[in-house]
Amino acid sequence: MINDNVHLGHRARKRFGQNFLHDQYTIDSIVSAIAPRQNDVMVEIGPGLGALTEPVCDQIDKLHVVELDRDLAARLREHPRLKDKLIVHEADAMKFNFDELAQPGRPLRIFGNLPYNISTPLIFHLLEKSQYITDMYFMLQKEVVERLAAGPNSKDYGRLTVMTQYYCQVMPVLEVGPHAFKPAPKVNSAVVRLAPWKKRPYEALNIADLQRVCQEGFGQRRKTIRNTFRSFITAEQLEEIDINPNLRPENLTLAQFVSIANWLTTHR
């Protein structure tokens, strides 16, 4: 009997959220979208068994890979074809300083089939380094991509949406079914491109205040904002910045979230 948890001699580890990509059409589509170039500083998060690593290395001379699984990191270091091209960082991507890989005049580009159990906190970690990054291509749960790309007035719109769109343009690339992985996940997946803005459309004076407004707002998303935000701004003050206090957090645009955060920053 074939064990679907074993692929290319490696047993998928549940605690690392491992699902290995093996469908060639999907692999080719992702690498084509990434379009690696020699001058790029390319970084792969969670290379696993090398499904994306190998075709990317066909197009560039050096690739940084960040892999937490000791066995997989060892396989990559000893890979007969790739070992001279790979710089293996055996590390937790959640704690990794991606900005240290940035080089003047060379685009820092990050990609990966992210473990679904850490994808949201990892995206928040990377957003903090966004000024160093040119773009990111990630395989994620389809529902996470829908949240990243959502607009106001939808159930998918939330804190992750607002904070990601504050830092990045969000562009869904392709949808991927469970058949493309071993073991097959119980959910559909999708690839998304996150491209940090060269000049943000709206600038928060204090990012911690924007985070607070999002956290408090979406923590009580069904309440009107006159109630949700009453600890720091009144209904009258909301009207002064042209925001209807009877709206709910899920009705607010990114620009309105930034306006409320900037009001908070300047009225302490």
From Swiss-Prot:
Binding positions for S-adenosyl-L-methionine per the UniProt entry: 19, 21, 46, 67, 92, 113
Keywords: Cytoplasm, Methyltransferase, RNA-binding, rRNA processing, S-adenosyl-L-methionine, Transferase
The EC number(s) this enzyme carries: 2.1.1.182
Subcellular location: Cytoplasm
Gene3D superfamilies found in the cross-reference section: Ribosomal RNA adenine dimethylase-like, domain 2, Vaccinia Virus protein VP39
Catalytic activity: adenosine(1518)/adenosine(1519) in 16S rRNA + 4 S-adenosyl-L-methionine = N(6)-dimethyladenosine(1518)/N(6)-dimethyladenosine(1519) in 16S rRNA + 4 S-adenosyl-L-homocysteine + 4 H(+)
NCBIfam families named in the record: ksgA (TIGR00755)
Protein family according to the UniProt entry: Belongs to the class I-like SAM-binding methyltransferase superfamily. rRNA adenine N(6)-methyltransferase family. RsmA subfamily.
Protein name: Ribosomal RNA small subunit methyltransferase A
Gene behind the chain: rsmA
